[in-house]
């Protein structure tokens, strides 16, 4: 998209150099060969735009990139699929000279755009505004109908190419999973010379455990105990993995951006806690692929969706603790802070009280919201907004 943007704004093809280091054309290059290759193709008396995908495959790539920055009139775009690209040892070379942009799977609104749907608003007979979604043939849908598809298939852009077909989606997600696991974890660790992360079966079991426990308080010890006690490990395995080994595998999953970890924050004490955190999976379609598309745990699924939507909107997100109660998310940036509860439904009185109680205990004046998957009438109660999940996700 950036290359297209440049061309649409008058940048000529000879100014753009694109290299994908998964291609056999480039994957055996050294840093010195990369430097010479680019220099030989520079435009005369014009700025160059260099695009390097998966450049971490090149040993000492950072030396070449730093030399381009010093020696050439150019803009440099480096893309990769894991945090290893910007690990501390490499980021040091580029500190203060680069901007990191994290790219997530599609939001619900982007999912609709990719599939050719349009969101329109009209006045509701009961007051306020009502959203409807239309396809290219003009057929209309309730937002919840399309949200159900998003919760099933997830936000990987490739889903738009195969359509909302379960078998085709499974094939696509299987390819994504295999690529992430084989290339971005096992192969990367092998190149690093690490010997801890070598077992694809153990890696898959840990991934499935975390996918099945999104939004639950989870410790490394609990992962290890569950794998052993429920006999989920390969019976031919010699010995049980240590907690240290499990920690290494989980760390690799976080580094590959398959899972994100969220920490707890004491609202009254105003400090992060060293108690159990939670994990969320980067794409809910990937979770459904791993667990067989079984329809369960909707509450944690929509919690997962809300967490990543908050990240897309530029918030730092933590779990809130107020006395002995928990707030699902504290979302903060330089301008604002929001306390957010997420629930499948607000229609039952006991659920309503459970979700509202922690927010009532917070004495500051920041915005407090409950996002409900099933909410008959969005209202404000005790200064707390209660809104539908679809409205939150479609709010721009």
Model-derived regions, located:
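Loop/turn-to-beta-strand initiation segments
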Residues: 46-49, 72-77
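Interdomain hinge/linker elements that couple catalytic modules in large macromolecular machines
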Residues: 118-302, 308, 316
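Short regulatory helix/loop adjacent to the ATP-binding pocket of P-loop NTPases
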Residues: 84-100, 112-117
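Conserved P-loop NTPase "ATPase switch" module shared by AAA+ and STAND
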Residues: 43-61
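Short glycine-rich substrate-engagement loop in P-loop NTPases that contacts/grips substrate
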Residues: 17-46
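Structural recognition of the conserved hydrophobic beta-strand(s) that form the central parallel beta-sheet
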Residues: 75-81, 102
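A cross-kingdom feature that marks ATP-driven nucleic-acid transaction machinery
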Residues: 1-11, 245-396
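Conserved catalytic segments around the Walker B and adjacent sensor/switch elements
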Residues: 5-23
